């Protein structure tokens, strides 16, 4: 399999390490707050409104100061760039150790958000260019990844005359330059600026942002008639929109962002106009009528899942060998090469490459149990195809990922796809009409679009209209839509989907078998290649973890989590990971907080969850109606073998309204999703894996005969 050329930033810290929180409150002292949030290097210089402000923070032996340029993990396998403007802690969080950072964001010239509409792009943008923006917000210091270097244009090219090629993993993701500012809400840029004047000087950066807000913000029309006095003068902002800048020839060295229509004068005079004749007023007094309230038309953008980013080298990582190992073993980190999936990679790559080259639509169905590398393999294929597209060996294409576990309803998939294609946020019904019109009509400028529909099981509805549309659009002659469906069930099309949908999937199917213990050993050893000389893991420990996981599920993610937890245990004992520590980590993971919550549920809550699982397996749908689950619960209680089953069943019949409280409590605890709490026809589905419920209720004496 070819090695990916694209580089992605290293995610050393993914928020709070979840394995640190896997035990109960008695073990809370094991949480290393210094590792997660860092420590202050000095006393606060200011206290105001319940906050204490500091000038520097030490985290993982690295000092971060106000004015430093950093990369920040965004919580979804990607990263942002910004400059630190504030470091502080809140009085209410002082005992928890939480510390906060406020950053002014930089927007990358080749980021996804900058490639929404081609007419908004600058013709001379560079792969290492970032723009200073007006956006800023608050984040936990646990999200800080590392320092980065942001130069002016002259400094950058004096240091790197030929630029930084993407193959330089040690330089490419952490060196950038700034020559313009951007206001993303109005799609306007500033004139070229010398960033060396602003670098590491927050006062000058703040003045620049104020000037950008004044000059780049959208103009608002003023109501009322204009007087006959002196003509008003409106100063022209010294900026230009993206639309006008895209019309300038990129080969011109004297590239100017000002519009050609601007003259040398600073002000533009607008002559007064004759006011229109006033219409005859109504008899009703307008002061007695209630005015219609104005509605804010802004819509929060949908959460579109980005591709995971490639890790950097750990040569300069400040930390112990065990910390390096845990960073490499994290499920969010992406290795340099994908192990043990060469055949599946080649099949998926050839299918997508041929569809993009021929500019045709296609459907591909990928199935396999959780943790077998389905999504990771598709991401690997997409990154290689994008690299070929950037090199000009493949036509341009767009990529959109829709995760069934991250949408509240299946119809939201329409809005996500439309927003990914156009950048416009519309309702699901409107988006469906727009997409149908787009894919049924030809367009000479349309490029191919690859849609990854992950967790397809969660997008199955009773009428199956969403899946039918997504699998039918690729068959249209002008759609150029390529749908890659990923599900955990191999026979999902035959068992659940109707014949009209199954026929559109065709014979393009790629099954993923569970990993064997040999493959799991290879995967773990490849992750630990960077710390092999430190002798952190023994070969017997890796072999023991691989065999334990392969005997149960073959889930690579579970194997990596077990090894990470064993590394923490070994670091506390100043030793290396042994089979005994692997066994201890496995025992702790089976006693996770989720398992404890499920085991401590009431009898009625347990019966309801068992009924949902049975209903899912019987119907094949992730969603069920409340009345269907109630009927399933009654059926389960009839077959119970416990001595007091009849008494409990009678209580259920007499006090059936209690299920309303059961539903509310399970929904509030995040165990299930509930559409409408007050209706028996409401739809309900699990918010956790059904395997967690089976593991928690196995051996429960109250549920004998049904669980």
Swiss-Prot record:
Q: Which PROSITE patterns match?
A: BAH
Query: Where along this sequence does the record place binding of ATP?
Result: 334, 368-376, 455, 488, 557
Gene Ontology biological process: DNA replication initiation; mitotic DNA replication checkpoint signaling; nuclear DNA replication
InterPro entries listed in its UniProt record:
AAA+_ATPase, ATPase_AAA_core, BAH_dom, BAH_sf, Cdc6_ORC1-like_ATPase_lid, ORC1/CDC6, P-loop_NTPase
Bias regions of kind Basic and acidic residues — which residues? 240-254
GO CC, alphabetical: chromatin; DNA replication preinitiation complex; nuclear origin of replication recognition complex; nuclear pre-replicative complex; nuclear replication fork; nucleus
**Residues found modified as Phosphothreonine:** 292
One matching Pfam family is AAA
Residues with the modification Phosphoserine, per the entry, are 291, 320
Q: Where is the composition biased (Basic residues)?
A: 218-233, 275-284
Acidic residues: bias regions: 255-265
Q: The BAH domain covers which part of the protein?
A: 62-193
Concerning PANTHER family, the annotation shows: CELL DIVISION CONTROL PROTEIN 6-RELATED (PTHR10763), ORIGIN RECOGNITION COMPLEX SUBUNIT 1 (PTHR10763:SF23)
The entry sums up its family as follows:
Belongs to the ORC1 family.
- List the protein's name: Origin recognition complex subunit 1
Please name the source species.
Schizosaccharomyces pombe (strain 972 / ATCC 24843)
